[in-house]
Amino acid sequence: ITSTHRSLAVSEKTVPGDGIANGAEVLAAADIAARRVIAADFDALAIAQGSVISASLFGALAAAEVLPFPKEAFEAAIAKGGKGVGPSLKAFVAGYDAARAGAPLTAPAKTLPRGEIPKGPAKLLAEWTALTTRIDRLPPEVADLARPGLKKVIEFQDLAYGRAYLDRLDTILAQDRAPFDLTREAAKHIANAMSYDDIIRVADEKTRAARVTRIAGEMGAKDQHLLHLTEFLHPRAEEIVSLLPARMGARWAANPRRMALIDRLFNKGRRMRSDSLRGFLTLHILGGLKGWRPKTLRHATETAHLEQWLQTALGYLPLNYDLAVEVIRCRRLVKGYSDTHARGLSKFDKVLAAISLVKDREDAADWARRLREAALKDEEGKALDGAVATINSFL
């Protein structure tokens, strides 16, 4: 008896790349090993009844008829518990019915969110329409990824930032050719690079109404309940300095004494109640600093790194199209916030440095792919170090 919903294991979360195991393979193995398999999304069934998964799994156990107890005995056991009896019985029945119905042995499909019609001032809507019109003129295979990319960068910053995104995409498209693999990959990875995680974005995400609604739903909170949210914060000196004006921040970052002082002041674990007025306003003010972001050291650093990455990819384009595509794909190594971002950036730089060593080989694109995959295998970078050592051995 198993639930088809997924709760990611620590080993899946800590992989730098996509470490999520294939749920379909797990279910297929269960089908081979077990005499009989009962599988359904028992977690969703329980949540829909305001209960927990143990109640719906209890119902599935009753439906399996492998224990010498009638259904009524299971229900009586729930009633004797005396806590949350009503929702638990409903979840029990839902699990029982799902097991009896014989739910298909497949992992649940991901539901993609449906697009929303934008609303706002007429001037901004006109600018938005102009940007979407530019996307409509792109090749269809590029436009499919450029649309969500445009939405992402505008949500991160503003419409002008969206224009900059499309300008970068047009520059690449002008040098591309059908079937436009280079521009298609760039549409996705440029959007991710432009929407980097900084203090402003993290604070903004923590004060979104959708986040509070999601957490309340996960906790089963009702209208009559008070929801207390505690944020765990651990800012580093680098993150504090990244909010300073670019030139000033660069001077501070280059001064070890100043960085040590900031580290002593800020680099400690903190708990902040974001449901309190003070905590919420602090995060809300930080999240509202989008207008300040383009002036910061972090923005200058990210933009310079982005431009250098694109310049490197386009530099390989005339002689090796596939290598240019692989360099664009290497951007997936850079993700996350704080230490995670720093580790990803270090791996990215190491991969591109190794690619430059094999750029003249016929199999350069294949080596670029191997290096990227090696970098994604483990957090410590041991696989990447091994791949680089292999390259150095035949140079």
State what each model feature region is.
Residues 131-254:
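Segments forming glycine/polar-rich beta-alpha architectures that bind adenosine-containing cofactors
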Residues 77-78, 94, 110-115, 186-189, ...:
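A glycine-rich phosphate-binding loop feature that marks nucleotide/adenosyl-phosphate handling sites
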Residues 55-64, 97, 184-199, 283-288, ...:
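Short, hydrophobic/amphipathic alpha-helical patches that form generic packing surfaces
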Residues 197, 203-395:
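C-terminal amphipathic alpha-helical interaction region
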Residues 45-53, 84-87, 174-186, 321-325:
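Structural motif
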Residues 119-126, 137, 141, 156, ...:
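Alpha-helix boundary/N-cap detector
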Residues 8, 30-34, 60, 64-65, ...:
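Structural signal for hydrophobic packing residues in well-ordered secondary-structure cores
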Residues 1-155, 164-170, 248, 252, ...:
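Active-site cofactor/cluster-binding pocket
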